[in-house]
């Protein structure tokens, strides 16, 4: 049965297991946070979904959304004297957006929660091992190209979690991250990541120039 979720459109992709701090200053999202805080702690959920077209801020900013997002659990909210909030959230599970209700102060979506499947269990261990090697190689190339140390995050044992971590921390554009989020299973995600990591490593090796590493657990959105 579809689930109704308040939505927080952002210019980024949130993945399950990743931490996302947010600075909430728009009135509509302040209201959303207050309504979430009135709920029992385990029900304080909203949907983070990437903006396909438009911008984060303003009543008419969002023009189109991607179809797959991530449920965020509100873990902490600190309110400022002027009513702004600094909140800390964690991605929990993916969802597919089915219907959009724009009649209230903020968007509400009718969503289907997407299960986390490993996929091909015979192929998964091989891809898991290959992605670990490719990710470490990529980080080494990034460090050499940027001439700055790049810390290696602790890699989880679970291949599903590994796939989300690699997707969130590799320097990819929004469309590529979104495609990784929307992959049907963990094996498909790892397979795509292996190709992307090899591509990015080759580019870094050739160009000796790199974007800033995105190894923090989550960016702060100005929303």
Q: Where are the regions that the model predicts?
A:
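N-terminal low-complexity, acidic/polar interaction/targeting segments
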Residues: 1-223
């Amino acid at each position: 049965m579809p689930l109704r979720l308040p939505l927080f459109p952002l210019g980024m992709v949130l993945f399950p297991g990743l931490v996302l701090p947010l600075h909430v200053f728009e009135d509509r999202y302040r209201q959303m946070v207050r309504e979430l805080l009135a709920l029992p702690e385990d029900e304080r959920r909203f949907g983070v979904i990437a903006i396909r077209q438009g911008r984060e801020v303003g009543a008419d900013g969002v023009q189109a959304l991607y179809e797959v997002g991530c449920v965020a659990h509100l873990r902490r909210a600190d309110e400022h004297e002027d009513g702004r909030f600094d909140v800390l959230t964690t991605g929990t599970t993916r969802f597919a957006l089915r219907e959009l209700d724009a009649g209230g102060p903020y968007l509400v979506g009718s969503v289907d929660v997407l299960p986390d499947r490993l996929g091909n269990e015979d192929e998964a261990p091989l891809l898991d091992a290959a992605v670990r090697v490719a990710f470490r190689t990529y980080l080494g190339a990034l460090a050499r190209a940027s001439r700055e140390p790049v810390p290696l995050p602790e890699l989880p044992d679970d291949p599903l979690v590994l796939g989300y971590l690699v997707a969130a921390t590799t320097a990819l554009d929004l469309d590529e991250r979104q495609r990784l989020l929307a992959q049907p299973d963990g094996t498909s995600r790892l397979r795509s990541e292996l190709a992307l990591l090899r591509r990015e490593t080759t580019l870094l090796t050739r160009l000796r120039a790199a974007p800033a590493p995105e190894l923090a657990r989550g960016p702060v959105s100005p929303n």
